[in-house]
Amino acid sequence: IRDSHKKYDIKILNFSVGYLPDSKLTEKQKILDVIDELWDLGIVVVAAAGNYGPGPFSVTVPGISRKIITVGSYDDFRSGRGPTGCCIVKPEVLAPGSEILSLSNRNNGFVRKSGTSMATPIVAGAIALLLERYPKMKPEEVKLRLYNTCKRIPSQKDRNWGIVDVDKLLGIISVSYTHLTLPTICS
């Protein structure tokens, strides 16, 4: 990915996989280190929250990384939920994740799938459109804009920022900005 980033100017990485909760800690740490390095290189990393919810602390690696954008499904009860072990609110953003039409090598080439791996490309695609419009944006700026444009869900303010709102994200609807401080819910 590092080589392709330089060669093709890759700006975004969709990571629709997660490590199983019982995976070795060293394996999890290696992927977290790589994901954080990619973010620091200027690649917006968008990762699935995993499908081990709905209980707390159920977001999978790499979605627990403080730096990256973690996506949950607002219409799938299995969607991973935070906080993380470091008390970070995760996932940050939600998108549709149930009965999404996807590709298959059977059933005439299509199948309906559900989970955060289906929600994550929706957010990654919205961010790709944003980066097409504003190609100089840094990952932190993308995350701030996402934070300021999500459709808030008052009943879930301690669990996420809200649902991705593509019109607001792209500036089609005006937005007021606030400073981003990653919320925590632990004392």
Give the label of every model feature segment.
Residues 5, 17, 21, 39, ...:
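Sec/Tat-exported extracytoplasmic proteins
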Residues 179-187:
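Single conserved hydrophobic/aromatic residue that forms the stacking wall/gate
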Residues 10-14, 132-180:
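C-terminal subdomain of the subtilisin-like protease fold in secreted/lumenal serine endopeptidases
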Residues 63-132, 136:
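Extracellular S/T/G-rich loop segment that most often corresponds to the catalytic His/Ser-adjacent loop
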